[in-house]
Design a protein with these regions (language model features):
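Conserved glycine-rich Rossmann-like NAD(P)H-binding loop of the short-chain dehydrogenase/reductase
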Residues: 1-13
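Short, small/polar-rich loop/turn modules that mediate ligand/substrate recognition or access, typified
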Residues: 142, 147, 202-204
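Substrate-binding pocket helix/loop in short-chain dehydrogenase/reductase
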Residues: 66-67, 74-79, 161, 172
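Residue(s) in the substrate-gating loop at a strand-loop-helix junction
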Residues: 110
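C-terminal helical subdomain
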Residues: 150, 173-198, 202, 211
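The beta1-alpha1 cofactor-binding region of Rossmann-like NAD(H)/NADP(H)-dependent oxidoreductases
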Residues: 8-9, 29-43, 72, 185-186
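Active-site helix of classical SDR
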Residues: 90, 126, 134
Length: 215
């Protein structure tokens, strides 16, 4: 497993924690919004391991503002990381998967990509765009032994969410039929399934992991 990210300090910390648990995870500092950097990183992975079986695209940022106040820079920055970055990563690994006749690509969308969200025109556009990208790639690559799917998380207990006021968290929970926020490991389980051979006949799907928010 190789993790690409821009934050070297957090990447190295993750690498150490994984090693302490007996997991072989390598961190590589990569800006996924830079196509040349991603292409070079993919080559390093292929050279080291001989192949690339699975790609999970979960790099993402937010830069929220209403349409009236949103700057072009805010718009473009989120597009570059969330949407273009996913395209770049898929493009960079594709030939390795085609050569092997096998691949699993899982893209991180969001429930807001399905129904929108106030003050997030840029972010929602990327998450909705990822759904369209996923379905199109699934049609193109399915016969090549490569499946492409997406996960659409709802409200998840992340470090950022944990800092929110309790009344805000209560409002979030009230919108979820199961009455609680999701856990990171529940999202990870969805990724793991879609990346596995058990999901070989799942292609072009958008798996909502949201406690029923989108029902």
């Amino acid at each position: 497993v190789v993790v690409w990210a821009r934050n070297e300090a957090r990447g190295k910390e993750m690498e150490k924690k994984a090693a302490a648990e007996g997991l072989a995870i390598t961190f590589d500092k990569v800006d996924t919004s830079d196509f040349e950097a991603v292409t070079a990183a993919a080559k390093r992975v292929a050279d080291k391991f001989g192949k690339i079986d699975i790609l999970i695209n979960n790099a993402g940022i937010t830069n929220d503002s209403t349409l009236k106040k949103m700057t072009v820079e805010q718009w473009q920055n989120v597009i570059d990381v969330n949407l273009s970055g996913t395209f770049y990563c898929c493009k960079a690994v594709l030939n390795y998967m085609l050569e092997a006749g096998y691949g699993r690509i899982v893209n991180a969308s969001s429930v807001v990509g399905l129904y929108g969200n106030f003050g997030q025109t840029n972010y929602v556009a990327t998450k909705a765009g990822l759904i369209g990208m996923t379905k199109t790639m699934a049609r193109e690559l399915g016969r090549k032994g490569i499946t492409v799917n997406a996960v659409a998380p709802g409200f998840i207990e992340t470090e950022m969410v944990a800092k929110m006021p309790e009344n805000v968290l209560d409002g979030m929970r009230a919108k979820v039929p199961v009455g609680r926020l999701g856990r990171p490991e529940e999202i990870a389980a969805a990724y793991l399934y879609l990346a596995s051979d058990e999901a070989a006949y799942v292609n072009g799907a958008v798996l909502s992991v949201d406690g029923g928010m989108t029902v």
